[in-house]
Swiss-Prot record:
Membership in a protein family: Belongs to the TRAFAC class translation factor GTPase superfamily. Classic translation factor GTPase family. EF-G/EF-2 subfamily.
N-acetylmethionine found at: M1
Covalent link (Glycyl lysine isopeptide (Lys-Gly) (interchain with G-Cter in SUMO2)) residue numbers: K64
Subcellular location(s) of the protein: Nucleus
Compositional bias of kind Acidic residues: 17-26, 34-48
Region of interest (Disordered), residue spans: 1-54
Domain of life: Eukaryota
Role this protein plays: Required for pre-mRNA splicing as component of the spliceosome, including pre-catalytic, catalytic and post-catalytic spliceosomal complexes. Component of the U5 snRNP and the U4/U6-U5 tri-snRNP complex, a building block of the spliceosome. As a component of the minor spliceosome, involved in the splicing of U12-type introns in pre-mRNAs.
One Gene Ontology term of the molecular function aspect: GTP binding
Residues modified as Phosphothreonine: T86
Modified residues (Phosphoserine): S19
Protein name: 116 kDa U5 small nuclear ribonucleoprotein component
Amino acid sequence: MDTDLYDEFGNYIGPELDSDEDDDELGRETKDLDEMDDDDDDDDIGDHDDDHPGMEVVLHEDKKYYPTAEEVYGPEVETIVQEEDTQPLTEPIIKPVKTKKFTLMEQTLPVTVYEMDFLADLMDNSELIRNVTLCGHLHHGKTCFVDCLIEQTHPEIRKRYDQDLCYTDILFTEQERGVGIKSTPVTVVLPDTKGKSYLFNIMDTPGHVNFSDEVTAGLRISDGVVLFIDAAEGVMLNTERLIKHAVQERLAVTVCINKIDRLILELKLPPTDAYYKLRHIVDEVNGLISMYSTDENLILSPLLGNVCFSSSQYSICFTLGSFAKIYADTFGDINYQEFAKRLWGDIYFNPKTRKFTKKAPTSSSQRSFVEFILEPLYKILAQVVGDVDTSLPRTLDELGIHLTKEELKLNIRPLLRLVCKKFFGEFTGFVDMCVQHIPSPKVGAKPKIEHTYTGGVDSDLGEAMSDCDPDGPLMCHTTKMYSTDDGVQFHAFGRVLSGTIHAGQPVKVLGENYTLEDEEDSQICTVGRLWISVARYHIEVNRVPAGNWVLIEGVDQPIVKTATITEPRGNEEAQIFRPLKFNTTSVIKIAVEPVNPSELPKMLDGLRKVNKSYPSLTTKVEESGEHVILGTGELYLDCVMHDLPKMYSEIDIKVADPVVTFCETVVETSSLKCFAETPNKKNKITMIAEPLEKGLAEDIENEVVQITWNRKKLGEFFQTKYDWDLLAARSIWAFGPDATGPNILVDDTLPSEVDKALLGSVKDSIVQGFQWGTREGPLCDELIRNVKFKILDAVVAQEPLHRGGGQIIPTARRVVYSAFLMATPRLMEPYYFVEVQAPADCVSAVYTVLARRRGHVTQDAPIPGSPLYTIKAFIPAIDSFGFETDLRTHTQGQAFSLSVFHHWQIVPGDPLDKSIVIRPLEPQPAPHLAREFMIKTRRRKGLSEDVSISKFFDDPMLLELAKQDVVLNYPM
């Protein structure tokens, strides 16, 4: 631009322009240009800008200095621009890689004293396999005993001698709490006294009564149990329950009396008293077995070889036979098997005649067990503990034990362990006991199948399983689900009963609800990898033959608790193994919900996983939408609520205060006959309700009596044991709410009054209505218990169209409710059996704490040969929360208690008494408790506050009530 033609403000100051011509020419040019531009715009909008960039005014903010993100990265890349940093300072911009690890596992296969190929070869010989569950009371030394077996077979697994290895406590939570939570399988090769090797599949189980469901899962796939008993504590609460459970599962029982060092080093009992203590334990166990078992040959005795003695802490384990073998190896020329038969009971050794007699030669003579076993044991322990420097080396030389100077300088505990380990050697006595008294999978298969398989034992499949045939059709029973290290997936653990399972094989997984008629609960899966589990490491194998335990990958998706795995084709008659029957009941319940409601799907996924992980855990959704978890006790639910948010769902979860489940029952017979008509007015059912005889509900639940029996056998049982008349006994239609439910439906109609053929045609519908009604009672939607419902009359339509299930089922349920409400209904609450161990001076404090919680003591006795007392008591489960903490506070931590569900008991008071006013935040007196429990349970479930009888009574029935002048406490 020529600066002389313009001033500093941009005004033109040059010579005059030829305006007329210029304007005309400029106008023509502009017009031509505009026409051209219009044409171009029609063809291609936007060309104008490109052709004449200098002709338009562009604002500063519209100028384009850089290419757009779309031009740089391409149209397929989404770019998001945020003008503000929404990420909190606590969250890193680049998050570290998060690894979830909840179990303690070996990184590589450890060195073993046997080759892995040898272990795999033994799997093919079922006669050399033993499937054993180690069970016992809490802290009676099961895990420590397995540690000894692991050390024996894994020479490089060294540990600090002052600290337990706890090799089977693979969860970090188990290590932190110091208590076993999960059953852990271990497979090792162990030699017997003669040096013959056997493959041992050992299940180490938790000792706490809350986790007895884990024991049940282990027992199902075992052929025998080794019951561990602390020599100082003796038979405890869980010991007795486990004996009963093992006998019910028809398993071989052997006993290991553990921690015998406590008798010597802690209680300081003389050898004779120690013998009496050990004999008392054996006698007590035999007494319990005879109480629960009908098999008179099931006797435990060290003479028979089914009792061994051990001290896991000091690596001691012997039977009479293995100790006699030590004498034979030391002195020679001794028939150790004959010698062992004379080492228990009232048998004495006469040193003059060198013979054994049943009569003491002198007044100071000791029994042979004391003289030949306890006294040498006492001397070894006393020498090591008492006089290490002077006489110990000489004593050890006499025993043929040689220690280095460095080993002699060890602390007392590791030194004593080392000396005992060298003296007693390997745990061959334990192996002898299991080999002789626990059947191999081949021998134990038939009783196992008869007890657990729902199909016929005489079929081809049943015979293949009874023979433990590795070439037969595949049948595998899984009882446990183990999560992976990160808690994302599960592996199924079970026992192959027939055939051989291969990696990569297609299989059919049958769930617990599968039947030949309804195959919905089944799925075809492909087996992933297969492992043999050894606690902290797994040995991968290509196949597992019948008789062995196996950990299976890839079949976890359809399995909830237990499953039956079979071949997908050609095995159509395969039926399932019956679900686990636990020896305890889940009565404690808590409600859970996510802190952030949008994370509900994550919580539901976590609930599904935790349901797989804990065998007896139950999860359900109430009508109010509340998610409820039911468990056996406080510790059990505490472990569940550790795993659910941290391991399986990774979200924050709110937990409600714990409550208990209730049951509903009646205490009298219905005051009048209750009837209900179907909606089409064509059918009418009349019933009454009355209480069952005492003990009958428990017999049904424990399967002492089964509805599947024929009518004659069923009739005889009720006639002889419960004094029923034969007609009523043979007229039992069903138990409810299922085949082992504690209620009975009886057809008490007369052929002269009722058309039995028509009634029989609607039997299934009436039974279904009865079972529906007993599953959800009218008081607070809880299970009905201990009630007998009698059908007194029935009017049934002639046409099948008018007596369909849609008419009969709801009517049967309604008449069940009305008969129940007319029979003085009551609530029942669960009661715990509590066992407390405490010193004598703390016993009074235990009484005080129990009395404050509606509890009462039933027995209070000293433990023989111990300074402790055992207090046995009952306490309502609803008042048991925090009981253990309260007890320890009052006894300065000296008392230790365990509690387990025992029975149901009627809550004092009438739940339907409207005259009772429930005042908030006030403890209610005893007569008001039933009303309080009912109202609060109904509120929590989202039900109306009181029972409305208009739901359950038809108009004709209400008129009948008015005629009979029956006073009702229920709101209309």
